[in-house]
Amino acid sequence: MMIYRLNALTDNYIFLLHDPQTGTAAVVDPAEPEPVLAKLAELGATLRAIFNTHHHWDHVGANCALRSRFPDIAVYGSSEDQGRIPEQTVFLKAGDRVPFGQTYFDVLFVPGHTRGHIAYYAPTTGDLFCGDTLFGGGCGRLFEGSPAQMLDSLNQLRQLPEETRVWCAHEYTQKNLSFALTVEADNPTLQERYAQVCRDRAQGKATIPSTIGLEKATNPFLRCEVRSIQIAVGATTPLQTFTRLRGKRDQY
């Protein structure tokens, strides 16, 4: 499976998946149709599916245009998002398995950012498409879910193999890591990552994908059990730590 990262809107990423052996393609969270159509034409590929992680407009904005162009495609999304994802044809729940080309995706239910948010994990290739749940150095805002839900979702993703590639849907890494340094300034791995990300962004390079291992070492939202971070935010439990981190990040 080939993965192509496409820029969209201001800071969104669309991911186009291509199986060269069959010539089929799928797209994850298409915000706009134009970059998707251009890449399909370049590859000579046929779009077979849309994989939506949640219902927000900047993740489903191209659904109607793409299904108009390719009326036979399947549009996947959470069963909790029924009626909120345009053109949705398949309603997924935790534990479902979705085939694509020579591989498949396990569906993970990761509410918090929204009440129906899901992620797509391909264990055979080690790829995770997590939408707005886990970001490089951060996590999504809580629009519909609770801190406890989001912490549970992040802990679920934290259990994936450390080499898992994390394909999140926004380029927020630099600001997220800048915030992370305010609560864990003495973390050398975090310092090194932030310096590298600053160099990459100065050259217009993407910081996605990261890995689960890197996030566990540098992302404060996956480190809520670390005592120094708890002390930095005046908390004593992982949930209290997460809640205070999220509040501070919202104001950063």
Curated annotation (Swiss-Prot):
- Keywords, alphabetical: Hydrolase, Metal-binding, Zinc
Q: How does it assemble?
A: Monomer.
Question: Which pathway is recorded for this entry?
Answer: Secondary metabolite metabolism; methylglyoxal degradation; (R)-lactate from methylglyoxal: step 2/2
Gene name linked to the record: gloB
EC number assigned by the record: 3.1.2.6
Q: What's the top EC group for this one?
A: hydrolase
- Recorded superkingdom: Bacteria
- What name goes with this protein? Hydroxyacylglutathione hydrolase
